[in-house]
């Protein structure tokens, strides 16, 4: 069986890892063993944080919507409830963008949510009054 010299393959692998470790501090950018450990860990963090980013942005959108809705005299939960009862299906990302950049349009959305909440409150209270008498 012929002897296999792995120098070229090993050098290419090491070069690839060291290329990924560019910008790291200290031994982690020079030594292959430290660089490999650091690159592996950085990939784990990147995988985890791609999932976390979605949660973080959703929380940010909710905070922005809540702040804008409270200025209009509603809470976030009541606003979302009113939108669903009014049949308006806009996701939180778009709602927060509208709240930040187009306040007039957002005020119209809040008004329609309030109207839907009041309409349902009036119809349910009338039904209960008839049952009590």
From Swiss-Prot:
Transmembrane segments: none annotated. It comes from Bartonella quintana (strain Toulouse). Keywords: Ribonucleoprotein, Ribosomal protein, RNA-binding, rRNA-binding. One of its GO terms (biological process) is translation. This is Large ribosomal subunit protein bL20. Gene3D superfamilies: 6.10.160.10, Ribosomal protein L20. One of its GO terms (molecular function) is structural constituent of ribosome. The gene is rplT. SUPFAM superfamilies: Ribosomal protein L20 (SSF74731).
């Amino acid at each position: 069986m012929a002897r296999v010299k792995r120098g070229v393959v090993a050098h290419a692998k090491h070069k690839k890892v060291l290329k990924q470790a560019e910008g790291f501090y200290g031994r982690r950018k020079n030594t292959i063993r430290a660089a490999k450990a650091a690159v592996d860990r950085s990939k784990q963090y990147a995988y985890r944080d791609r999932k976390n980013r979605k949660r973080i942005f959703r929380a940010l959108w909710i905070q922005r919507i809540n702040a804008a809705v409270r200025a209009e005299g509603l809470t976030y939960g009541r606003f979302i409830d009113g939108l669903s009862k009014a049949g308006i299906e806009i996701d939180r990302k778009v709602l927060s963008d509208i709240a930040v950049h187009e306040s007039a349009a957002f005020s119209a959305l809040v008004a329609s949510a309030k109207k839907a909440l009041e309409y349902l409150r009036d119809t349910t209270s009338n039904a209960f009054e008839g049952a009590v008498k």
